[in-house]
Each structure stands twice: as structure tokens, then as C-alpha cells.
Amino acid sequence: MGTLRADEISNIIRERIEQYNREVKIVNTGTVLQVGDGIARIHGLDEVMAGELIEFEEGTIGIALNLESNNVGVVLMGDGLMIKEGSSVKATGRIAQIPVSEAFLGRVINALAKPIDGRGEISSSESRLIESPAPGIISRRSVYEPLQTGLIAIDSMIPIGRGQRELIIGDRQTGKTAVATDTILNQKGQNVICVYVAIGQKASSVAQVVTTFQEGGAMEYTIVVAETADSPATLQYLAPYTGAALAEYFMYRERHTSIIYDDLSKQAQAYRQMSLLLRRPPGREAYPGDVFYLHSRLLERAAKLSSRLGEGSMTALPIVETQSGDVSAYIPTNVISITDGQIFLSADLFNAGIRPAINVGISVSRVGSAAQIKAMKQVAGKSKLELAQFAELEAFAQFASDLDKATQNQLARGQRLRELLKQSQSDPLAVEDQIATIYTGTNGYLDALEIGQVKKFLVGLRTYLTKKKPKFQEILSSTKIFTEEAETLLREAIQEQIELFLLQEQT
């Protein structure tokens, strides 16, 4: 048996001491006191930060929302069925963030930016905080470029600009989502990245929207963030912030983006559920006191950036659902006060066959004509006033037995104006076609036609202009001004098309 010499032993010990790497890792831990309804109460976690991500023993992630003297209230980003009372928990030292990249375009993801469309993982090298601060005053500039929705009623009377926040509000089943999806379809070829956030909707409704985008060729510039009705409240609450983080990524890269939140009523309900389960004091309609801040910090992230930051933009179109047309409820009034205008959709108009069912009288854009091209301002300037006067006159005329000729003419003109605003779903119009349509109506060219013939005539006129008078569209797209030459070309086309149309109708 060999003997070890004392100097060998000391050398081995010295080597071991030199190799010893003393690494102390401090982990902030806690113990689950109670779990249920998507909420966990944790004892310990003394150093935890508000909004910090918490990791449970079995892998579920949560967010620390309530920091109380003797426990921490954590909302779970998952069902948490495997979490047991007494199991250990650790703080991660991170706050919620998601990966971001160009590869997200054309994909359907959840609130954690994980793909749910079965097309594999999404590669990304960057990440972005879900809750980012909104651009400051110096970082912004005023809105001046139009974001064309393709809907005549909106682009002519309630114009939306790039960087604006325009609320779409109305009862259920009045076409709110249709207005939003048509806006996305109309961005084809406009170099605008679109993000559609579905919050608490039926999975079948989301699938239908995705199919509409695919058929219209819109998925190549669109990201869909979906948390359906069966998702945990925490994820429904986070989904809009995830969408905003993705849109911001493109905005700060000098791109134009548009984001639709469908809808914020359901996000507020999810937040209310979380807050009540966390035992936060309820306020009006049982919503927590900070529900205004919930939406304001989200919508303030929409902006038109200054030239120093590259003039990118993020246009927000939040949707809010009302009950029986009550816009004075808590969430509708909150979001109306945050946004730069609202498009009000009326159930009565929808049921009367006027679609999109936009109530022009109480819809407004606080950016106004700054978000219109000059040609549209020239043509559509007086149409909103005419329609408002017509609506008033129509209500009065119901009680009058004999009306004078001027009133009858005004009513006839109003009915035709209302008719030209009707549009089929997924059929957005180019701005040149809209200008031709409005000009035809406001200048009395439709007065000779029956109301039932208006739509057919306008479709024919737009086709005729494209084929026989292409110069009209060239002038408008190049100069953005309704010049005398353009007006002459349009007048000629209308006269020729009316003669042709009346001849066809007689035969």
C-alpha cells in the first residue's frame, strides 16, 4: 500500500482551494398559503417588486400584483391546477417581457407571444417589455397623415390620422369588428403593419377574422394576438399590452402601425375579476379604482413620433361594447375621454339595413380634416352637415302631412346621400373612388335615380372611371388635390354613365 507524503497532501489541498469558486446566489423564496380562482397568496417573498414574475415549483408563472404586510397576492398566467398549498415559490427578478421580430408577421400568437397557429416556433433575437412607458411630449408630433379605412362614411366625415386613437363603440352585433377588419384589409399596399388583438372572444369568431385576413391577403402584414373566452383572466388582461409592445417595436423602426383592441370592455371585466379576487376595494360598477389607468397607459402608447425618432406611428382603434346604447356607463365614458374621437355604431341603423351602421351625428374625430388629403376636404366638406340636417328634417317630416317642394328635394337628396354611404363587408374603397362617389351625391347627380338604383349606378361609375378615365385617378393619386381637370373628367364620366345607365334600365 503506497503512502502519501505530507507535501503531496498539502499540494492537493492548495489546488482544491485555488479551484474553489465561491458563488453565492441569493434567491427570494416564499410558500403558497392559498391557491384558487387564478390567484395565489404567498407567504415570504419579502424582496419582491410590484409586477415581478414569480415562478412556482411546478413551472407556472405568475405576476405579483398585491404587496401586503403579511402576504403577496399573485395572479397566475395559467390554470395552476398542479400548485399545492405549502409548495415553494421563487421570485425571478424580471418583469413581463416578450420576444419581438419581423418573423411575427402573418402569425397568430397568445398573450405570452407563443404561436398558437400550429406553424412552429417564431425566431427572434430581441425582447421588449410588455409594459413600456408611452412616448413623451417632445417625442411626438401632431397627426397629419391619413389612415384610410376604405369606408366612405369614416374617411369623409370622421377621418382617422396615423398616430390617432379612435374609439369604435356600439352594442353587440352592430358591426364593430367588421369596421376594424375592413380597415386592416384596406392597408394592403399602404406599408402599414397591423396588429389585431382579440380579447375574451369565442375561438370561432377569431378563426373567422383570421380567415377573412387570409382571403383578403392581409395576413402578410398582420399579427393576430388572441386570448379567447376560456383563457385565464390574467392573460386576457395582458393581451392588449402584448399587442402594443409588438406594434411599438415596428413604430420605433420608422414604420407605420395600426392596432385594434377587440374589445377593451372584456379586458376591463378580466381586470375586475382579478382585482375582486385579490380583495381590492371595488368602485363604480364593481371595477377597481385604477381601471382608468388600465386603459390610459395602454392607449397613450399610440403616437405619431417626431422626425428625430423617425416619424413612425401607432394608430389605436380600441373597441368598446355598450349595453342598450348606453354610452354613459363607466368603461365607455373612460375610453371616450382618453381617445381622440369615437365612431358610434347604432343598432337601430344596423337593423334598418344601413351598414356600416355609423351614426354620423354623434360620431366625431378630434383630429378632423388634418387627417384628410386636400381632395377629400374639397369634396366632403359639407356632407356631414347635410346629413345631420337631413336626419333632423326626416324626424320632423314624419309628423308633417304636406311638405313644400324644397323640403321634399332636401329629403330626397339626404336619402341618396345615406344610400351612397352603404358598403358591403370586406369591400373597402380606394380614396379616389370615395371622392368620385361623394361628389356624385353632393352635387345632385343621383337625384334623378330611384333610391334602389343608387348602389348599382355607383358601382358602374367606379368601373367606368377606372377603364375610360384613368387620368382622373392618376391626378388624385399624384397631386392629392381635386383639380379643375379632375372635376371636368369626373363630370364627363358621370354624365356619360347616367345616360348609359338610364338607357340600360329602360331596356
UniProtKB/Swiss-Prot annotation:
Catalysed reaction, written as an equation: ATP + H2O + 4 H(+)(in) = ADP + phosphate + 5 H(+)(out)
GO function terms (MF aspect): ADP binding; ATP binding; proton-transporting ATP synthase activity, rotational mechanism
Record-annotated site: Required for activity: S363
Gene Ontology CC: one annotated term: proton-transporting ATP synthase complex
Coiled coil: none
Pfam families attached to this UniProt entry: ATP-synt_ab, ATP-synt_ab_C, ATP-synt_ab_N
Enzyme Commission number, as recorded: 7.1.2.2
Binding-site residues for ATP, renumbered to this chain: G170, D171, R172, Q173, T174, G175, K176, T177
Compartment list: Plastid, Chloroplast thylakoid membrane
UniProt cross-references to PROSITE patterns, sorted A to Z: ATPASE_ALPHA_BETA (PS00152)
InterPro entries, sorted: ATP_synth_asu-like_sf (IPR023366), ATP_synth_asu_C (IPR000793), ATP_synth_asu_C_sf (IPR038376), ATP_synth_F1_a_nt-bd_dom (IPR033732), ATP_synth_F1_asu (IPR005294), ATPase_a/bsu_AS (IPR020003), ATPase_F1/V1/A1_a/bsu_N (IPR004100), ATPase_F1/V1/A1_a/bsu_N_sf (IPR036121)
Similarity comment: family membership: Belongs to the ATPase alpha/beta chains family.
UniProt name for this protein: ATP synthase subunit alpha, chloroplastic
Record organism: Phalaenopsis aphrodite subsp. formosana
Gene that specifies this protein: atpA
